[in-house]
Amino acid sequence: MPAVADCTVVFPLRHDPASTHPDVSGLVGKAFERVNWRDAFDTFLAEERSALWAAKTAFDNTDTSAYIAARDALFPQAVSGVHGAVAFRNRAGHKLHETMEAVGLWEYLKGGATRAKGTFTFVDVCGGPGAFSQALFAMGKEHKLRLRGFGLTLRNVKGLDWYTDLPSRSFFPCYGIDGTGDVFKLENIESLCSLTCKENVRLVVADGGFDVPTEVVNFQETISCRIVYGQWLSAVKLLRPGGCFVLKLFDCFSPFTRAILFLTTHLYESVQVVKPRHSRVVNSERYLVCIGFIGAPKQWLEHFERCYQEGFVDNDNIPTVLPTSLFSGDKIFGADVERMSATIASNQVSGLHAILEKLQSKPAMEEVKS
């Protein structure tokens, strides 16, 4: 048996309570420094990152079906199915359920919904085809809550069309001002904000991502920075005070990701990273869970928006949203993000090594071939 297993793990992220908000005034009006996604790492957990990359690279020439067979044999827990009376469309629904349950998010949301007569609105960003929305409606019913949902996703992209059985009277697709549903365009996020301006937006969920070719899979984190930031900014603009946010992340080694996490600890009352059971131990996926939106100072929001419009000029280069000098001295945050990143990476390496050993053993290879 492998030394690790698929199970839900929670990591708190905090900043030093004695510290003040990071001062972005010195960044106003300045041109954004950028770095290519291949060069977007520093020395943070460099040894752990190298070990993880090596463990992934070991499978470059492995047959995909053989890898999947060995993985599923060793880690059978991350499978789809029924939770209680709720059946989810796919594993994404299980991931969201486990993530929300792990931090008591439904109990928090029910408190706010009670004051709003049992109703609240969620927004599903980059959500097509709607696994998260479907799961939220199902779980909301279990918790005796009435939900209204709005969703933004790319239009006319195979596999991203909204599920036809999402409740038509309670779920409202949005494709932005230009009709594309492209979250990379700030005006489409603004359109979604206008559409929900009178709604009690208590929850934003964001599960966006895309397939990364095998030859650059080690750079999944930095290749995904633009879509991660777009979803993160969407929540900052959409949420009402006290609202919550669930965002899919990958590795958290780069200065960009750490800067976003640090800023997040100042924007919400409670921040945690959850690795749910259905998010396989051998992959880099994890979920950022933010509870109790405090709000962003006007200067911050202006800086965030300018970073999105002027900093992300293409998909290859990543702007500096916050210099490391503004968060590297926070020892509490540094310890939390290091523990989270190192633990998930270590578990991932152990799981990948177990799969490799199974593939290299003669009985396992014969079993896979049969």
From Swiss-Prot:
Keywords: Methyltransferase, mRNA capping, mRNA processing, Nucleus, S-adenosyl-L-methionine, Transferase
pH dependence: Optimum pH is 9.5.
Tagged with keyword Transferase: yes
Residues at the active site: 248 (proton acceptor)
Sites where the protein binds S-adenosyl-L-methionine: 130, 207
MF-aspect GO terms: mRNA (nucleoside-2'-O-)-methyltransferase activity; rRNA methyltransferase activity
Subunit structure as annotated in this protein's UniProt entry: Component of a complex composed of CBF5, GAR1, NHP2, MTR1, NOP10 and Tb11.01.8210.
Protein name: Cap-specific mRNA (nucleoside-2'-O-)-methyltransferase 1
Organism: Trypanosoma brucei brucei (strain 927/4 GUTat10.1)
Gene: MTR1
